[in-house]
Amino acid sequence: MEPEKQREGFGSRLGFILVSAGCAIGIGNVWRFPTVTGQYGGGIFVLFYLIFLVLMGLPVLTMELAVGRAGHGAARSAYKALEPQGSKWHIHGWFCMVGCILLMMYYTTVSGWMLDYFFRFLTGNFDGLTSEQASGIFGEMLSSPVEMVFWMAIITVAGFIVCGRGLQGGLEKVGKWMMSALLVLILVLVVHSFTLPGEAARICVLDTFVAVCAGLIIFPACFSFGISPDAGPSLIFITLPNVFTNMAGGRLWGTLFFLFMTFASFSTVIAVFENIIACACEDFGWDRHKACIVGTAALVLLGLPCALGYNVWSFIQPMGAGSTVLDFEDFLVSNLLLPGGSLVYLLFCVTKWGWGFDKYAAECNTGDGPKMPRWVKPYFKYVLPVLIAVILVQGLV
């Protein structure tokens, strides 16, 4: 029982909400959501997105939070505290840790791109460049192994330095500051974007708010300068730098945008790092200092295939011609581990072979706030697993 007594918790509910939202808010909110929205009907897509956010995303989120709060630990130890005696649900805890590590094997590289571009705009590297020259900088960055590894390592080291200061003194303190700054930045960028010429359950709300606001930044800005918004990295590192180089005060707005992107990605990095550290401390008996040192070294090494996959190891094309290591790692996380993990959490919380719906609902109803009604039980037990299984299968075929 001694490790449980020493386990640090969040200092405030606001800190928990902002850190959790920081983990959810990331690169996909900016380089995927706005483009997919434009491709699939605009407001109609957002409407259906919000419906499924409530029908699928929110229930699974409550399950993860309930397991963590009731189990008082990281994934594996929380499962062990709640699972029926003799069952093996805690094995999924190892997959949770592997998923976090796999995510960080490429996410630190992409976060490094954001930091790189922030400093490029801050120091005026884009000043006076033509559209072709601005577009070429991204390719030059990808082709440089030294630059790619350098920024990836900077993000990794910085993330573990923050987490090394403890949950409240590190992740919560920095996360609250970064998320507050991120929300201010995105509001400033939205307001500025609309001044350009031309026509153009709280964690879930914040995540969706940032995604929608990203669209309000990107589309008016692109259309004002006659530039078609792309998807993925091309949107962030080719399309938008072209917009900023053609815009009055582009250096300032480019700097603020990539500062926003750095905050969005780094808030995810430190939240996932904290999860990795918690797992290492609880499962291996390490102290936080050792977990941070080992984690830094391990993730810098494990991040090399992604960072070097665009240059010296570009011959590795795991998903066919033109693919990269990042594509493969992202496929494993997004198409297999995330929906698969959601399905396991769901089955653990609603079946009699796991924690059970009644205990899960009782945990959700602990404390103040809205209560979980009993009528959702059939939906959670019989409909929601099928919906998530369909997403899992669809992502793999």
Spell out what each predicted region is.
Residues 4-7, 35-40, 70-95, 108-168, ...:
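Inter-helical loop and helix-membrane interface segments of multi-pass membrane transporters/permeases
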Residues 9-20, 45-48, 87-101, 149-155, ...:
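Select transmembrane alpha-helical segments in multipass membrane proteins
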Residues 14-52, 224, 234:
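Transmembrane helix-boundary motif of multi-pass solute transporters/channels
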Residues 15-17, 149-150, 205-214, 251-254, ...:
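Loop-to-transmembrane helix boundary motifs in multi-pass membrane proteins
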